[in-house]
Each structure stands twice: as structure tokens, then as C-alpha cells.
Swiss-Prot record:
Gene3D superfamilies: 3.30.1330.30, 3.40.1280.10. Its main location: cytoplasm. S-adenosyl-L-methionine binds at residues 197, 217, 226. Belongs to the class IV-like SAM-binding methyltransferase superfamily. RNA methyltransferase TrmH family. RlmB subfamily. Keywords: Cytoplasm, Methyltransferase, rRNA processing, S-adenosyl-L-methionine, Transferase. SMART domains: SpoU_sub_bind. GO terms for molecular function: RNA binding; rRNA (guanosine-2'-O-)-methyltransferase activity. InterPro entries: 23S_rRNA_MeTrfase_RlmB (IPR024915), Alpha/beta_knot_MTases (IPR029028), Ribosomal_eL30-like_sf (IPR029064), rRNA_MeTrfase_TrmH (IPR004441), SpoU_MeTrfase (IPR001537), SpoU_subst-bd (IPR013123), tRNA_m1G_MTases_N (IPR029026). This is 23S rRNA (guanosine-2'-O-)-methyltransferase RlmB. Its EC number is 2.1.1.185. Specifically methylates the ribose of guanosine 2251 in 23S rRNA. It comes from Chromobacterium violaceum (strain ATCC 12472 / DSM 30191 / JCM 1249 / CCUG 213 / NBRC 12614 / NCIMB 9131 / NCTC 9757 / MK). GO terms for cellular component: cytosol. HAMAP family: 23SrRNA_methyltr_B.
Length: 248
């Protein structure tokens, strides 16, 4: 299977150029653009010896499937994204803060989760290989550059990964509406992996059984549920808030 894939949009491509330029194979930029963002891509691509083509909008529309490409598309070597979970854990300077997505298959949701994970300083996003969205151009665009900097680790056996994390001293907190413990009465300041289930289905039974604790997000309005990326942002933000308070 080819490791090449397309990404589009200035956020995603600039993140690649600055964070992982060797993963860029070539870039296509809309002709006639002389704005600062286009110039920044031109200059950085030249500095990193990344092949760049000036093409018309129709070519970019065709390449991106008429997505909102903002006038720039790139081909990347996705194999250079590979990150091992053990490497992530071994190189941290603070207790792990992880986001685990169990059955999130929508690329827009994955992109939004990566974006909030980056904003809240999560060290990695983990998902099972067989029931998850894959990194693609849509994910990269929605993530606004976060897909290029937050490790997205897919695992063959999520239950085994949860056991390995426990052995490494990481507490596993699953989120569910039925939990007795709520987010604002839970100590989320230590080494922690938040587990989010698929919208409408929640966590799978085996995943739930591997959680150390189940936590609910208090709801004070009329809506009964939240988008998975919104929920992810809330729990990660609470972990960060508690860590700041604990540090004094």
C-alpha cells in the first residue's frame, strides 16, 4: 500500500514545512497568488528543497476533490509520520496526558480532536486501527496544522494498549453520561489517558472494562450530548487547569 497522500490548506502545509519538511514530496500552488501566505510557502519550500509547481485553480480543484484547498495542495510521505507510543512516553518532561478515541470514524471529528489535543498540550491521540478515521486531507485541513504535530498512533489491540498504559502508571478515565463521578469532582491532574467513545454508541464494552474510572461531563442546559471534539476539549482542558493549580 502506498504511503503517499494529499493534504491541502495553508495551515496543514505550513506545519509540514516547519515541523517535518522531509515528509513533503511536492507542492502545487495556485498561480497569480502574491499574498504573504503564498510567499511564505514559496520561500520555505525553496529553502527546504521541496519541489513546487505553479498551477491553475482547476488543477487544484481536481486534485483535492473540490475541497476548500485555499490554493495549495501537497503530496506527503505518510510513513514519515510514524511515532511509537513507547517513544512518546519515554521522552516526556511531565506526566502523560493522552486522548484515546474508541470508534471515531468521521474525519472531521478526528481533525477537530487533533486540534483540541494540540491546544491543550496532549502528548498523543491514540485509536484502534480497525474502527477509526485515517489521516487524510480532510483531517489535516480541519486540524489546522495539528495533524502535523500531534502524534496520531493507531494500535492493533486497544485493550492491550490500555493494559500497557496502566503498567506504565497511566490512569485510564473513560467518559460516559451514566458515570457517578463528574468531571469537576475528579482528580485529573496526574498521568492520565482520557477515553472518548463514538458519538451515539459510546465506548465498546471491552474498552469500558479496561477503564480505571468512568467520568461524566456535567450538562447544565437542554442538550443531552456533545460532539466528541467538544467533549475532548473539555476533559483535556480540565486536566490542564488542575495541573496549573497543583503546580501553584
Amino acid at each position: 500500500m502506498s504511503n503517499k497522500r494529499l493534504i491541502h490548506g495553508f495551515h496543514a502545509i505550513n506545519a509540514r514545512l516547519w515541523q517535518n519538511p522531509k515528509s513533503l514530496i511536492e507542492i502545487w500552488l495556485a498561480g497569480g497568488r502574491h499574498d504573504a501566505r503564498a510567499k511564505a510557502v514559496l520561500d520555505k519550500a525553496g529553502a527546504e528543497n521541496v519541489k513546487l509547481h505553479i498551477v491553475d485553480k482547476e488543477r487544484l480543484d481536481s486534485m483535492s476533490g473540490n475541497a476548500r484547498h485555499q490554493g495549495v495542495v501537497a503530496m506527503i510521505d505518510a510513513s514519515m509520520n510514524y511515532v511509537d507510543l513507547d517513544d512518546v512516553l519515554e521522552n516526556l518532561s511531565e506526566p502523560p496526558l493522552l486522548l484515546i478515541l474508541d470508534g471515531v470514524t468521521d474525519p472531521h471529528n478526528l481533525g477537530a480532536c487533533l486540534r483540541v489535543a494540540d491546544a491543550m498540550g496532549a502528548h498523543a491521540v491514540i485509536a484502534p486501527k480497525d474502527r477509526s478515521a485515517t489521516l487524510n486531507a480532510t483531517v489535516s485541513k480541519v486540524a489546522c496544522g495539528a495533524a502535523e504535530v500531534v502524534p496520531y498512533i493507531t494500535v492493533t489491540n486497544l485493550a492491550r494498549t490500555l493494559r500497557d498504559l496502566k503498567d506504565a502508571g497511566v490512569w485510564i478515565a473513560g467518559t460516559t453520561m451514566e458515570a457517578d463521578t463528574d468531571l469537576y469532582h475528579f482528580d485529573a491532574s496526574g498521568p492520565l489517558a482520557w477515553v472518548m467513545g463514538a458519538e451515539g454508541e459510546g465506548m465498546r464494552r471491552l474498552t469500558r472494562e479496561h477503564c480505571d474510572v468512568l467520568v461524566s461531563i456535567p450538562m447544565f442546559g437542554t442538550v443531552e450530548s456533545l460532539n466528541v471534539s467538544v467533549s475532548s476539549g473539555m476533559v483535556l482542558s480540565e486536566s490542564r487547569r488542575q495541573r496549573v493549580l497543583k503546580a501553584g
